[in-house]
Amino acid sequence: MNQFIMLGCLWLGACATAFSQQQTNGVNYQLGPMPSVHKPLAENSVPMGSIQTFEEVKLDLPITSGPYEPTWKSIEANYPGTPEWLRDSKFEIWIHFGPQSAGESGDWYARKMYVEGTPAYENHLKNYGHPSEVGYKEVLRDWNPKKFNPKALVDIYKDAGARFLIIQGVHHDQFDMWDSKYQPWNSTRLGPKRDLIGEWEKAARKAGIRFGLTFHHEYSWWWWQTAFQSDTKGDKKGVPYDGNLTLADGKGKWWEGLDPKYLYGINLREYETVAEAANSRWSPPQAGIFSGHLEYAEWYAKWWALRMMDAVDKYNPDFIYTDGTDQQPFSGSGTGTGYKCDAMQRVIADFYNKTMDRRGKVDVFSIVKFRKQTNGTVNTCETGIPENIKTDQAWIAETPVGDWFYGPNFVYSSDAVIRYLLEIVARDGAVGVSIPLRPDGSLDECWR
């Protein structure tokens, strides 16, 4: 690791001194199969439904029994306050690692490899082939982090002064990094064929360091829309990319039995602004409801929630983290565009009730990214610096030292990263620093 960043880390450390059933406290829940959907209509031809007239759906999804009900009111009333260990922990490592690193194209490789003219698209052509023939599913199959050694990495991070780890559970690519009950596209069945989250958990517990799991799959249903495109010019013009494949198309192929819809989702490009947003640098579609896909939307929200509950069941994390830009996932606007439901409240209530059962107290927290701070949730500040000191709440700032996923020769200067660390800690925040791992699971030499 770069010696200057390591020194900064040490200083901060010193400052700190379906597929099966879910069992929830005696309640069995069987997630049904993905609902069928109509044939896609013409692109950009369907207006989004109104979020003003669409009432938030209360999901029929059981949670672990306990004092926490799946409402913000109950969560805020029962939560005992942010644990002191977060207040005392000013530096942590953000482990933003997964198969997208295999593209060596930085963040969002899985989406950008389907956008003509992007570096990710060109890199994919060179290293794998055309996305109509060799898509992201083949990246998953071939990804082999053979040098991934979580024990050695955790020791490095702890020596650098990290007090807890932020570990990516699933990114927007929908690939679960654990032995997932509900997602067959996972790291125990494809690629490394290892329970990567389980390995991180064991290493963290052995080192006596806390950890949390992050989940970025809520808005994957519109994020993945580039996989339903095709080239607009050249020899492959009009040939659909592999997001258009079906379960039946896999017969006799290596991915037989794996449904591409559980990876890429369904084609939603008929809704206004969805295709445009998919090809933008960042912008989500306009606020609204995917009103022609309400049965699928409800199923999708349950699938999202159950995968998080599954990871909590298996690994007993010290916090959970959901990505997004609005006040909660599935809000109907921002990254939560498409549906409105109480999936987030159910996940948090289940997490806190489970923790109470296991530990006898709730010494954990939930990050709902960019949610206005409320009792029961913690918010974050990605790469920004608040104007004022924020002593009224525990909060976390996060920044990568290069791109979020590995990209060669993309590194911020040491003094810029250290300056960021100091600015955040001076404002009473904690800092999560992402140091991207190489595709093989090793640290780049410049970070050692």
Model regions and ranges:
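Bacterial N-terminal signal peptides
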Residues: 6-16
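Mature catalytic domains of secreted/periplasmic carbohydrate-active enzymes
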Residues: 21-448
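Short intrinsically disordered, low-complexity coil segments enriched in acidic
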Residues: 2, 16-19
